[in-house]
Amino acid sequence: MLKPLGDRVLIEVSEEEEKTVGGIVLASTAQEKPQTGKVVAVGPGRTLDNGELATVPVNVGDTVLFEKYAGSEVKYDGQDYMIFSAKDLVAIVE
């Protein structure tokens, strides 16, 4: 399994619907980029200037909302993931 470093978070991105409510199939270029996903791994946090560790504010299993164009795509063991810095996470979905 991948273990993020620093304040990074590994997310399994939610799949978006390929059809509209009316049943029209959308081309992949017309689909909105997903902005939610499930946290699968969390780094230890970021070391502050005073030496203290600022932990990441999410936990494994959380569903999060993230910035639309942030993060890096990663493929590991046949699965697609994205890695984000904690600052690119917008909210926890409850």
From Swiss-Prot:
PANTHER family (UniProt xref): 10 KDA HEAT SHOCK PROTEIN, CO-CHAPERONIN GROES
Pfam families: Cpn10
Gene from which this protein is expressed: groES
Stated family: Belongs to the GroES chaperonin family.
Quaternary organization: Heptamer of 7 subunits arranged in a ring. Interacts with the chaperonin GroEL.
Entry GO MF terms: ATP binding; metal ion binding; protein folding chaperone; protein-folding chaperone binding; unfolded protein binding
Protein name, UniProt field: Co-chaperonin GroES
Keywords for this protein: Chaperone, Cytoplasm
PROSITE patterns: CHAPERONINS_CPN10
Matches recorded under CDD domains: cpn10 (cd00320)
Species of provenance: Tetragenococcus halophilus (Pediococcus halophilus)
Superkingdom of the organism of origin: Bacteria
